[in-house]
A protein has these predicted regions:
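Phosphate- and other anionic-substrate recognition elements at nucleic-acid/protein interfaces
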Residues: 1-171
């Protein structure tokens, strides 16, 4: 009987008013595997309460369908363009934290990554643009060149998972 190590299952978020979600599996010495990536677009014409409820429900559905998780991580929010943009992100952040809490999960400070660290994980450069991040994620996961993330938020969430892998594995 072989003793096979179970892969680490990572749930990663790119949190905004239109958040990205990714589920990635990783086993030491193996290539990370994309299990699921999605994002949602909230309607800015809706009330904040409606938008945050939708974000929370989507996160809860994802946690229910793809859990259990060994790690939950997110991109660290460093400030919005203005007060309203910051409020939107913090509201989405709280909505996701509510969903996580319902299933017994939290996000440790050590599992939050700066935008530069996320970009570097995907591309090798902390100054990459969105298209470079998407291409880097495809390359790192060996996804076909024609694999399309339907929103930047999806590839960004995958890049967050890659940042966690890079910071928690031996090279």
């Amino acid at each position: 009987m072989t003793n096979r190590q179970r892969p680490t299952r990572i749930l990663a978020f790119d949190i905004s008013g239109s958040p990205g979600f990714a589920v990635v599996e990783y086993a030491e010495g193996k290539r990370p595997k994309l299990v699921h990536a999605t994002s949602i677009k909230t309607d800015s014409k809706r009330t904040d309460a409606e938008r945050y409820a939708y974000i929370e429900a989507t996160a809860a559905k994802l946690i229910y369908e793809y859990g259990p998780f060994d790690v939950v991580c997110r991109e660290h929010f460093v400030g919005g363009r203005n007060k309203r943009a910051s409020q939107t992100v913090f509201g989405a952040w709280a909505a996701i934290d509510l969903a996580l809490g319902r299933f017994g999960y939290t996000i440790d400070k050590a599992d939050e990554f700066t935008p530069a660290a996320v970009k570097k994980a995907a591309t090798g450069s902390g100054k990459a643009d969105k298209l470079e991040v998407e291409a880097g994620v495809r390359k790192r996961l060996v996804l076909p060149d024609d694999y399309v993330f339907t929103a930047d938020d999806q590839s960004d969430a995958v890049a967050v998972a890659l940042a966690w892998i890079d910071s928690n594995t031996t090279k």
